[in-house]
């Protein structure tokens, strides 16, 4: 085992041989890195719980057709028999990954983390008796491993007897045994660590090196066992056929609903009392229907980050959150300040916040100290027992009581974004020119360039749940798994500036002087809508605003009635939904984006009179204002791609919740504050929980089918855009997404074929 190390030592006296050896080592390093990069392409990144992002579980296979990718992955997973030695390797790998990647849950921190996973393993593995079983030869081998992970991979591949032509496949198989942990490491190295700055650096090269070292010790015949997999694709082919049948039925039903509405697509309405711009999220669709029925209101759909690639630091927060799609890199840093009306309680708020921080620090120190946890339980046990009783028996009352106590100690204050460019600290804020540019692009993308109402509400969204590790999965995906109200508030603040409006007028967007913009947030769990600063505003239209608040409450009630039918509850709708948002034992506070099926890019008039059952992403778009297709290009290459990620996550979590989901919430354990495991040692679960897609163990609630994109625009414009972008060719021609065009000139439906030709749908 140590021949490679010995070779390094015995050749130090021969300069020519040393040069040749160094060249060989460097060449090996490059070859290993190239192989790892190749196999990593098929790995799907796994985002941490705090910013849980929907992602296609087979993202790395999108270069294949949908059918080929599913067959290859499903048959491979079903063809892997139980292997006790493999399970032992997995157990040790989980132990090392959990220790290294922990971000504050563990009491003791793993040493040497700042030097990387492999380096830390190299220094500590000789002391791991569970791994080497006190074998002197294995301990000696561990102590003499190469310092570079690439060299360790080469050494282990040779020891395992993996043939050169099989090495890349073997490395692929090595990653596939723990795709969750490997995917999380890929996220760190390729998404989180975009600037190369990481406190505890880690890469898939480290991961593979550590795993292969463990494999050499515990499963030396691994390369032979990998050849014994059996594959059977018959069940998978039937699964794909069932998906196709659902897709065909849904497409016929949707197009049948749209057909009688085509003549209304370009009808211009009179000036509305209020316009509300919601996220394209499928949960917005039923609420939009409810509010439109209650008054002269117009609603629009737009990506929930409102076109602003920003990072936002909360008023009370110590961290900065990226509030834009993960496909984008934030360009601007924004922070918050208290509004003038809250000046009287700022001091009280700051003192209360400091008091709570002190209590929290003391509690954490007592809880995680070696000697004090028992004393902590003895002293706080009765109070914790009372709290547990209230949370379990009366969650709504417990939530209200907690909120009232928090208000007494640390009163909440309303804030506003600070977004003007700081001339001294140019990393903070947005320049005036960029404010104008982003405001114009947002208005044009949502089709709001004229006929402005007196009130325009930009409505982001978020959720409210208790004891839910997957809370961020219910928040706004377009905001990177964060709540979208702050983005809405920021865009409203920009558009309320007179200088911005004047610049927009020069570019053809005339906003009336009596138009006022507000930011708001829609709670998708309870359907409450909070309009920011509406109670302290000194502007006009208070009568319209008061009526809008009343109608929003009624829309909440009506939508609760509609949603409760899907939640299988016999209680009062409003009461039960309020309970779900506060009950810490509730495994299904809401259905999230389950049953999503279509992405419609069209004027609201086309869908306004249709009950789409909360299954459609709705993006407002008027092709007559976009003759060159520039706006449509942005919609198809950004929000539609995000919708496809969401759709495929729900699809694969439904068809195989063990392989692509995360199993039942009941047996979840949070691991290192980064993800969840099933039980005390499993792969890092990387999909949706069973309760997010299944009514019960044998009945799915989500209907697994690929995304159907419907675009109301001329076919030739769409064809040009598809040919222009590889991502669109991949998604449409490999049939990960279906595309239907509604030609506004003849009102016929056309389906895009693999050859970039169109066939009429009868």
From Swiss-Prot:
The gene is dabA. Part of an energy-coupled inorganic carbon pump. The keyword Membrane applies. Pfam families: DabA. This is Probable inorganic carbon transporter subunit DabA. PANTHER family: INORGANIC CARBON TRANSPORTER SUBUNIT DABA-RELATED, UPF0753 PROTEIN AQ_863. Keywords: Cell inner membrane, Cell membrane, Membrane, Metal-binding, Transport, Zinc. Zn(2+) binds at residues 279, 281, 461, 476. Belongs to the inorganic carbon transporter (TC 9.A.2) DabA family. InterPro entries: DabA. GO terms for cellular component: plasma membrane.
């Amino acid at each position: 085992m140590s021949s490679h190390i010995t070779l390094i030592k015995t050749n130090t006296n021969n300069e020519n041989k040393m040069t040749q050896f160094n060249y060989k080592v460097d060449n090996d390093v490059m070859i290993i890195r190239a192989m790892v990069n190749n196999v990593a392409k098929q790995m799907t990144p796994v985002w941490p719980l705090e910013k849980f992002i929907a992602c296609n579980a087979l993202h790395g296979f999108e270069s294949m057709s949908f059918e080929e990718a599913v067959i290859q992955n499903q048959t491979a997973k079903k063809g892997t028999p139980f292997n006790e030695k493999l399970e032992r390797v997995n157990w040790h790998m989980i132990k090392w990954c959990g220790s290294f990647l922990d971000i504050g849950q563990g009491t003791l921190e793993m040493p040497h983390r700042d030097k990387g996973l492999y380096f830390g393993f190299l220094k500590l593995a000789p002391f791991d008796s569970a791994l080497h079983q006190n074998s002197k030869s294995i301990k000696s081998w561990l102590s003499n491993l190469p310092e570079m992970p690439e060299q360790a991979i080469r050494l282990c591949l040779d020891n395992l007897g993996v043939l050169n032509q099989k090495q890349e496949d073997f490395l692929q198989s090595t990653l596939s045994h723990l795709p969750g942990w490997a995917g999380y490491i890929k996220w760190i190295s390729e998404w989180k660590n975009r600037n190369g700055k990481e406190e505890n650096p880690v890469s898939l090269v480290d991961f593979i090196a550590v795993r292969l070292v463990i494999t050499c010790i515990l499963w030396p015949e691994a390369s032979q066992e990998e050849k014994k997999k059996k594959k059977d694709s018959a069940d998978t082919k039937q699964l794909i056929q069932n998906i196709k049948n659902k897709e065909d039925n849904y497409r016929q039903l949707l197009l049948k609903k749209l057909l009688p509405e085509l003549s209304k697509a370009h009808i211009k309405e009179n000036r509305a009392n209020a316009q509300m711009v919601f996220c394209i999220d499928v949960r917005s669709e039923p609420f939009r229907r409810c509010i439109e029925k209650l008054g002269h209101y117009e609603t629009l759909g737009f990506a929930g980050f409102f076109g602003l690639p920003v990072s936002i630091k909360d008023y009370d927060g110590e961290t900065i959150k990226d509030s834009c799609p993960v496909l984008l890199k934030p360009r601007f840093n924004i922070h918050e300040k208290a509004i003038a009306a809250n000046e009287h309680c700022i001091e009280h708020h700051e003192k209360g916040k400091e008091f709570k921080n002190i209590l929290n620090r003391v509690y954490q120190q007592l809880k995680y100290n070696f000697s004090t946890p028992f004393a902590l339980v003895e002293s706080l046990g009765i109070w914790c027992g009372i709290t547990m009783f209230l949370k379990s028996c009366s969650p709504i009352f417990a939530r209200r009581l907690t909120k009232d106590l928090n208000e007494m100690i640390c009163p909440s204050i309303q804030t506003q974004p600070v977004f003007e460019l700081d001339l001294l600290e140019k990393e903070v804020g947005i320049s005036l020119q960029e404010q104008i540019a982003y405001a114009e692009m947002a208005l044009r993308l949502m089709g709001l360039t004229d006929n402005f109402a007196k009130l325009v509400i930009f409505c982001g969204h978020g959720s409210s749940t208790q004891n839910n590790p997957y809370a961020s999965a219910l928040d706004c995906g377009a905001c990177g798994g964060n709540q979208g109200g702050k983005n809405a508030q920021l865009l409203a603040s920009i558009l309320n500036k007179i200088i911005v409006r004047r610049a927009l007028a020069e570019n053809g967007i005339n906003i009336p002087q009596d138009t006022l913009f507000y930011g708001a947030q829609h709670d998708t769990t309870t359907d409450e809508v909070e309009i920011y600063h509406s109670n302290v505003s000194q502007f006009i239209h208070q009568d319209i605003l008061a009526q809008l608040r009343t109608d929003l409450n009624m829309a909440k009630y009506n939508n609760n009635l509609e949603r409760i039918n899907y939640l299988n509850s016999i209680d009062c709708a409003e009461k039960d939904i309020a309970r779900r948002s506060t009950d810490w034992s509730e495994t299904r506070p809401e259905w999230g984006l389950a049953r999503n099926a279509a992405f419609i890019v069209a004027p609201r008039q086309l869908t306004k009179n249709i009950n789409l059952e909360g299954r459609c992403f709705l993006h407002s778009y008027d092709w007559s204002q976009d003759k060159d297709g520039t706006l449509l290009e942005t919609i198809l290459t950004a929000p539609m791609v995000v919708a496809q990620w969401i759709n495929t996550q729900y699809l694969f979590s439904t068809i195989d919740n063990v392989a692509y989901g995360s199993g039942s919430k009941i047996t979840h354990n949070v691991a290192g504050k980064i993800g969840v495991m099933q039980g005390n040692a499993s792969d890092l679960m990387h999909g949706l929980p069973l309760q997010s897609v299944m009514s019960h163990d044998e009945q799915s609630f989500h209907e697994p089918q690929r995304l159907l994109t419907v675009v109301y625009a001329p076919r030739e414009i769409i064809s040009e855009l598809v040919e222009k972008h590889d991502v669109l060719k991949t998604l449409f021609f490999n049939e990960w997404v279906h595309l239907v065009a509604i030609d506004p000139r003849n009102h016929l439906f056309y389906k895009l074929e693999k050859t970039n030709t169109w066939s009429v749908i009868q």
